Amino acid sequence: MHVSPDNVPTMAFDWGSIKWFVTPSAVEGASSTLGEVIVNPGRGHARHNHPAAEEIIYVISGEGRQMVDDGEEFAIREGDTVHIPAGVYHSTYNTTWRPLRLIVTYTPGGEEKALEAAPDLTLHEPGRVAEWRQA
């Protein structure tokens, strides 16, 4: 199955945006979730966990700070990969003036649904460009 970014909704938040390209609810037979996350400059995704799924983060571009399992933060940059076991608390912050672009997976998929309840969520329909706002 081919999925184009133009055919996928954009979830926009105060800290950045996400496009989920593959989810169990959107792609028949899929058991994992895969998407692109953009963390805006100087922003971040606060401490949280995914009780039922491991997460893998691959840094496409940019730099930031990552915390895993309430441990000490460490630097992440283009080419780095971070594995987060199921249930482990973690956070990701962009520490530069450029966007931090990530590929994120959840296994098993479905944990992305929790973001639908985020108070700062704005959902942009497929094909509509999400407006970026400086905080």
Predicted regions and their residues:
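Short strand-connecting beta-turns/loops that link adjacent beta-strands
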Residues: 27, 52, 71, 97-98
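A short beta-strand-loop-beta hairpin characteristic of the jelly-roll/cupin
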Residues: 44, 51-78, 88
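Short glycine/proline-enriched turns and hinge-like loops at secondary-structure junctions
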Residues: 30-32, 49-50, 95-96
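Conserved hydrophobic/aromatic beta-strand scaffold that supports enzyme active sites
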Residues: 10, 20, 34-38, 56, ...
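A short, N-terminal "cap"/entry segment at the start of jelly-roll beta-barrel domains
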Residues: 1-32, 46, 117-135
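Ligand-binding loop in jelly-roll beta-barrel domains
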Residues: 73, 77-78, 86-112
